[in-house]
Amino acid sequence: MRGSGAKIAGVLPLFMLFIAGTISAFEDIERLRIWPLPAQVSHGGRRMYLSGDFKLVTEGSKYGDASGILKEGFDRMLGVVRLSHVISGDRNSSGTGGSALLQGLHVIISSSTDELEYGADESYKLVVPSPEKPSYAQLEAKSVYGALHGLQTFSQLCHFNLKKKVIEILMTPWNIIDQPRFSYRGLLIDTSRHYLPLPVIKNVIDSMTYAKLNVLHWHIVDTQSFPLEIPSYPKLWNGAYSSSQRYTFEDAAEIVNYARRRGIHVLAEIDVPGHALSWGKGYPALWPSKNCQEPLDVSSDFTFKVIDGILSDFSKIFKFKFVHLGGDEVNTTCWSATPRIAQWLKKHRMSEKEAYQYFVLRAQKIALSHGYEIINWEETFINFGSKLNRKTVVHNWLNTGLVENVTASGLRCIVSNQEFWYLDHIDAPWQGFYANEPFQNITDKKQQSLVLGGEVCMWGEHIDASDIEQTIWPRAAAAAERLWTPYAKLAKNPNNVTTRLAHFRCLLNQRGVAAAPLVGGGRVVPFEPGSCLAQ
């Protein structure tokens, strides 16, 4: 918001305010109660209080906020800060000390655009002054989306003073310089195995912002159901569980817009040629036969016309540069078992494996024609890696050592190795999520640059709207710090961050996120009465 009319006396440049030296001892780091841990932090020992009419000021910013993204983010930040208690104290009185009253936040953004581009600058610099300094905190960022991250960090500095019943910031002055380690920090949700209503998906998106995750991988369809409306082929959503468990095209556009305004990309996935039985509920011609319904019919041009129609429709609303085409767990026996397709294979002198390659590469060409770069699951690389389009990103989920091989071949990679980053593995504790290193055994800088980041996967076979949040959180937060915080700042022993993660879990609870206890694996119940800090 430009030109609020507020005057800011003596706001100092961020670099002049930055105190030399950063937090290094883990004992001190654990006192910070910030998650994920910023790149550089220094603080003092004073306190300030938030004014009752805490303001957003944008004088000097090139970003005009015509779309309201910054103002909405500021309002959300204040909302969660004030959510945990009723603020009944006089937040503007001398009782809090006039010089200790923080009047607002001065945000300066150097880019005038709010286009959400993959790889855009997400850095920010945050200064909260001491009581003797200017009465405005200052946040600088290259992009509005970096500023949103800064707002999240600012919200974690705010605490409720039980005696004065106002919001305070302890340990001022604060000086934080921060940016993400990886550009891709993802969370997968699966709406085929169990339908997730729109409010649930929006709640997941909101919770992602608290941990600075930035990609929602929407595994929309699979064998079990096809819940999304595709205007080009309107019978496809006949594969939904019921008419009430569907997403209209406008619903999908709303999810994309909701996420975008929070700095989150939406990666859409259609998993082909396997995992696609539900497609044939509306168009049986997509099946090899009525008795052999998966994978999709490789011999039929109609199959690829449908894929083209889906991706054409996707391109109207899913604006992320990538689309996910799956390609995993393809059992090709139906092709040889169906006489018509077996004859086609013979005519084209293809084995089942060669037909699998043909299908994946043809689907890739269709995606490229609609302006997308492609992500495929790792089986495509294992089976015919040298044939993949060079714009392919290989999504690792099976083999821990695959990332090294993918990057050595010159292809990009996303890490989701199931032994550590699959959230549906209920017995997997948060420590494994924290310790999982995307650069494991990769020391070459060029190969490291090809690792885009990582993603935790919330597969939907055994979760629905009733338990998705406590299955995701707090374990996803452990991975989020791995993907955000500089490697040198990460704890070598995950147990060293237990106190800070417990505070973040309590913070999620206070913000209405049903994050489970840390003790045990995922989705565990509290083992006895007690504080959320101890569980």
Swiss-Prot record:
Annotated EC: 3.2.1.52
Post-translational modification (record): N-glycosylated.
Entry's pH dependence statement: Optimum pH is 4-5.
Recorded catalytic activity of this chain's protein: Hydrolysis of terminal non-reducing N-acetyl-D-hexosamine residues in N-acetyl-beta-D-hexosaminides
CDD domains (UniProt xref): GH20_HexA_HexB-like
Cell division as UniProt keyword: no
BP GO terms, sorted: carbohydrate metabolic process
GO annotations of cellular component type: nucleus; plasma membrane
Record note on disruption phenotype: Reduced amounts of paucimannosidic N-glycans-containing glycoproteins in roots and leaves.
Pfam families in alphabetical order: Glyco_hydro_20 (PF00728), Glycohydro_20b2 (PF14845)
InterPro entries hit by this protein: Beta_hexosaminidase_sua/sub, Glyco_hydro_20_cat, Glycoside_hydrolase_SF, Hex-like_dom2, HEX_eukaryotic_N
Membrane spanning stretches: none
Chief place of localization: membrane
Keywords of this entry: Cell membrane, Disulfide bond, Glycoprotein, Glycosidase, Hydrolase, Membrane, Signal
Signal peptide: 1-24
Family that this chain belongs to: Belongs to the glycosyl hydrolase 20 family.
Record protein name field: Beta-hexosaminidase 3
Species of origin: Arabidopsis thaliana
Gene: HEXO3
